[in-house]
Amino acid sequence: MKPENPTIEICPGITRRTVANGETMYQMLATLASGSRMPEHSHSQEQIVHILEGKMRLIVDGVPHELSNGDSFYLASNVPHGVETLSATRVLDTFSPPRKDYLAIDEKVRQEVL
């Protein structure tokens, strides 16, 4: 992870930081406070969620799935999903194709710091 990659708040209690990206993949580390929620959303990228530590409820198309340390979950593109954390949680998220929206925000924040 490059030290210049900024930490960005996605929604209250949830931050992300770009770990790596390439032509066809994007990876980020998300940190979620206990009790935080990410509203239901969808995106065109496929996503793999890997729980590094903690416990959360991933709600996929209205169906809850409890995930904890070491669990992974695949999300197809455009599938509605949201998150409720059950404890402080760290997640490694991988997307394909890359999240160009997130990379653009990273670049904007870096430019504001200069």
Please name every model-derived segment.
Residues 12, 28-42:
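Conserved short histidine dyad/triad with adjacent acidic residue
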Residues 62-77:
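Short acidic-glycine-tyrosine-enriched beta hairpin
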Residues 48, 55-57, 64, 80, ...:
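Structural motif
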Residues 37-38, 54-59, 73:
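Short beta-strand segments in beta-sandwich/barrel cores
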Residues 77-101:
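Ligand-binding loop in jelly-roll beta-barrel domains
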Residues 52-53, 68, 87:
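A cytosolic small-molecule/anion-sensing beta-strand core signal
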Residues 31-33, 43-58:
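Short, conserved beta-strand element in jelly-roll/cupin
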Residues 1-24, 104-114:
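A short, N-terminal "cap"/entry segment at the start of jelly-roll beta-barrel domains
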